Amino acid sequence: MDVVGENEALQQFFEAQGANGTLGNPTLDTSLLEEFLGNDFDLGALQGQLPDTPPYSASDSCSPPQVKGACCPTLTPAARGTPAALLHSANAPGILPAHQSHSSSEMSNSGLPHRTFHNCYPDASHLMSPLDQSVSGGIGCSYHQQPLCHSPGVSLPPTKKRKCTQVLEDSGDCHVWTHHSRPMTGRSHSIEVQDLDSERQNMMLADQPSPALKWQPYRSVPWHSLLNSQYEKLPDVGYRVVTDKGFNFSPADEAFVCQKKNHFQITIHIQVWGSPKFVKTQMGLKPIEMFYLKPFGVKVEATNQIIAIEQSQADRSKKIFNPIKINLLADQVTKVTLGRLHFSETTANNMRKKGKPNPDQRYFMLVVGLYAANQDQFYLLSAHISERIIVRASNPGQFENDIDALWQRGQVPESVVCHGRVGINTDAPDEALVVCGNMKVMGTIMHPSDSRAKQNVQEVDTNEQLRRIAQMRIVEYDYKPEFASAMGINTAHQTGMIAQEVREILPRAVREVGDVTCENGETLENFLMVDKDQIFMENVGAVKQLCKLTNNLEERIEELEIWNRKLARLKRLSSSKSSASEASSISKFSRALSASSPKRTISKKNSKVSFSGKKQSCPNWVFQSLVITLIAVMAFCLKDQDRCTPSAPSSNLTSSQEPALPSTASPSAPNTTLATTLPSFQVPEITFCEILPCQQTYCCPIWGTRRGLSSPMQRQLEEQEPHQGPWAGRSTSFLAAEAQTNVDWRSDWIDTTISSIQIMEIQQIIDRRYCSRSLQCGSGNYYYHIPVNKYTPTNVKFSLEINTTEPLIVFQCKFTLGNMCFRSKIEAKGMESQQEVSQEMTQGYQHIWSLPVAPLFDSGYHFRVAAPDLADCSTDPYFAGKFFTDYFFYFYRHCV
């Protein structure tokens, strides 16, 4: 019967209690009735006291909306039609055709219409079309909105009492979307809603004892925009989905698990800004007739495959869930709860293998979408999708027993013990702990090292460890994407070693860990891993050996420095002794001459005239003065000759056996050069005929003069030569004799000889065929006489390439430019400035020198190949062949 006042309500209460036989029960709680009798009749006041719980299966399809001091308008049955299915439109994505269900079931047996609130559970059920074929009928929901009005005089059908939802006005749900009085654009509001949604979700996750199912926006098809009556675009709809119950998180599966027999429940919060009147489609603006909510499932591996959602009925049967029709008021939050829902299918590969999760496990995802309806078309406004879900036919709790049994609470507080092997990102750990991925350790990793636990302790050979480390190859590489993904490796580019190569050098540092399967199914049999601790200890031994070698080298360097100081001191002593011995020899020689002077009589038989030594001979002091003067002149000549003649072959371009470069030349005087003193046999000439035409002879009269030039290093050497004195040869011989009693110095120094010499432009090799016959070609000094073909033009470039087997330094100590060969003096003067050699030193393995050979009739060059920091152009020639090697090149134009 309809309740219209206190008497009718009281009568209805007593009739119900009397029929059930509970009126005399002392435990009967009549507080609700007393409060109702004490207040004015208000449907909203009565419903406000009901708890906020989802509807149960025996109740009506939808709870009446909570009203506070307002009335509810009556809806005619024609206005309450609910679509039975949502179908995709062929010409517009996201548009679903709707078919109105019959409204004959909306009338009760008493002839009165159903409750005039929006019906959230249509009775009609139809299959869905391709977009959401999982749509089901018979929906259970709690539907709330603010504010709603109730028309006076409306009668309510007698139904079972059920919980109602609370009014969202002044409730905790109102802070989800904060509406500003100022206009808001869709984009700014969407960002704000997402931020508030994430904060709300985080707060809920913090309050809940177990993880909650997470949701995110789902845009499988474009969302449509809403417009008001002024054709102004409204901000995006505020949309949030919360999972109430039905899903349990499984740590073993790393996913939420839902039992197909148990129902789940979700709550949707919807906020509309402004008053939406139109929806923007590809066909233009369409008026909005109604809003619909529709949940469905999709497969993770194929999101185009739809999983239908079912709902439990009062008789425990299940029916396909149909979209529910909702009414969204302007600038209000609408809360809709969908309960008693089930997935129509279970996920594939749910069976476990040996009590462990199946590696081929399949997953579902739940989608809840909001649509705007226009005639028979539905347009998607917003949708959210959940994370992956496993749907099993049995209780998921039974799968956790075998996992939990391995973990026990330890004896130490706040400790957990696992008796077995632990694998992270792997289902087959072969060690106590196997981690597939990166691992961060903020502390230290300790290893057992107590001597009481060790035996057979032996010292290792550090020299052998150094040899093994020197053989190991360090490489950069990239892991294959399929392997890195399977192993959880984020950084594919690494630096390290190859296990196969390490096994050949250090077998105990490589281990086989079995077969490894990549993400693409490829199996790596007997996968190898490297024990870097073993390699680290090898490095420690190698460093110790290097320290020993360094100490030995330092000791030898100190000894060499001591020997160097001793040699320098002996050299100075030898020079001073030689000067003293020379002075003493001169005095002795003068005394010997004076002692051997004749004091006898010279007679002639024919004339019989005799000269008496006492009477007719000159005084002794005259003879002594004459002898001393002669000896002084001889000594002066010897010194002058020593100054003019160099003490070593490195100071002259040629020796006395072969004439030097001419000092002067004139047109009337013929050219006298080394070319006239060459041996009779012929050596290969430097010719450019293979690359240039050889038609003209360049052996013209010589206009220029010989010019001897020296580099700055040579000038420094010449400044030091006067201080060496003429006794450098004696000092050198003394040092050579001293060195013969010691070890061979050459074994300690770098080889300073040249491996190859060639003219780069014509690839002409300069070898021992060009060695001088009259001068030595070895023992630290090499002399080369190189003839140049007479057809060689005067403007070609000569590049001398010197190659060494060690990283050495090549000094150009001296060069001598001989006679120029041009047709006129003007041409000769034009080339004067281009003949200067400016390069002083090169270093490395390859040394290239550009020499002005072509413009000159003859020229000479002195190069010194030295070890770094051991010699230069000023080094004593005695060390030739030890610290450096001298090379002399004499180029001349062969005009015979």
Swiss-Prot record:
Species this chain originates from: Bos taurus (Bovine)
Residues of the Peptidase S74 domain: 449-557
Coiled-coil regions listed: 541-573
InterPro entries xref list: MRF-like (IPR051577), MYRF_C2 (IPR025719), MYRF_ICA (IPR026932), NDT80_DNA-bd_dom (IPR024061), NDT80_DNA-bd_dom_sf (IPR037141), p53-like_TF_DNA-bd_sf (IPR008967), S74_ICA (IPR030392)
Gene: MYRFL
Family according to the record: Belongs to the MRF family.
One of the Pfam families matching this protein, by short name: MYRF_ICA
DNA-binding segment(s): 111-403
Gene Ontology CC entries for this record: endoplasmic reticulum membrane; nucleus
Stored PROSITE patterns: ICA, NDT80
Example GO BP: positive regulation of DNA-templated transcription
Cell location: Membrane
UniProt-recorded name of the protein: Myelin regulatory factor-like protein
Transmembrane segments: 622-638
Classification via Gene3D superfamilies: NDT80 DNA-binding domain
Membrane topology reported for the UniProt record: Single-pass membrane protein
